[in-house]
């Protein structure tokens, strides 16, 4: 059985090729303005990495904020899964004993509680502010003149505790600017930013209350 999963997110599009429960190929590209083009680009690259052709694929499933575009780009797509279900099944695939999973996407953060079969039985989504999403880290990185990819490793160089109280990404950026003006080390600011996001995610996990069904 050859299956392909496509996650068309706000920032990146990811494709994974699975054969009999084993990942044999994958690819990731920037989503860009033309999501259809990004999906096809990631699809072609993943199939190339897996050393298979489109005719070898038995099943295609799409998820992510652009999941409806997946079916438009690849008409043979059979299934569309919402983000919570895909997150739960993905976490369970890698960590069968996991009962709590958090996913920080570019535009929103999500948390879910899983049962022993990897089904999400409770969940919460932060959709109101970028302060709980990857865009928050990216925006703070711009204030620090540091690329997103370097923010995590930079934070790991610090062991200081600097509280950030702002619950809004705009006000948080003002806090970061204030820390810069006080000559705070860049790695300490980066750690404070990550700690603030982690705190929001933990609060979301503890306060998860299912408000939607799928």
Regions found by a protein language model. Name each.
Residues 64-66, 211-214:
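Glycine-rich phosphate-binding loops at beta-strand->alpha-helix junctions
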Residues 32-35, 117-160:
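Glycine-rich phosphate-binding loop plus the immediately following alpha-helix
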Residues 67-105, 110-122, 202, 206-209:
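Conserved phosphate-binding catalytic cores of ATP/NTP-utilizing and phosphoryl-transfer enzymes
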Residues 151-189:
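A mobile "lid/hinge" subdomain adjacent to the ATP/sugar-phosphate binding pocket shared
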Residues 3-41, 45, 122-123, 127-128:
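Short glycine-rich, Thr/Ser-proximal phosphate-binding strand/loop in the N-terminal lobe
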Residues 174-210:
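Adenine-nucleotide phosphate-binding core of ATP-dependent small-molecule kinases
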Residues 43-58, 201-212:
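Phosphate/pyrophosphate-binding loops at sites that engage ATP/ADP/AMP, CoA/4′-phosphopantetheine
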């Amino acid at each position: 059985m050859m299956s392909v999963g496509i996650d068309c997110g706000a920032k990146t599009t990811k494709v994974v090729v699975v054969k009999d429960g084993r990942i044999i190929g994958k690819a990731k590209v920037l989503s860009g303005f033309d999501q259809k083009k990004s999906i096809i680009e990631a699809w072609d690259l993943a199939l190339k990495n897996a050393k298979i052709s489109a005719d070898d694929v038995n099943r295609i499933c799409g998820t992510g904020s652009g999941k409806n575009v997946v079916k438009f780009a690849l008409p043979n797509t059979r299934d569309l899964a919402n983000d919570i279900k895909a997150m739960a099944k993905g976490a369970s695939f890698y960590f069968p004993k996991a009962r709590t999973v958090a996913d920080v996407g570019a535009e929103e953060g999500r948390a879910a509680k899983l049962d022993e079969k990897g089904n999400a039985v409770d969940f919460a989504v932060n959709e109101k502010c970028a302060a709980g999403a990857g865009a928050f880290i990216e925006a703070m990185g711009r204030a620090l003149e540091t690329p997103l990819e370097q923010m995590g490793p930079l934070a790991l160089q610090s062991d200081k505790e600097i509280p950030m109280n702002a619950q809004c990404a705009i006000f948080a950026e003002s806090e970061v600017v204030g820390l810069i003006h006080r000559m705070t080390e860049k790695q300490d600011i980066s750690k404070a930013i990550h700690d603030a996001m982690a705190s929001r995610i933990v609060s979301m996990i503890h306060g998860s209350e299912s408000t939607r069904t799928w």
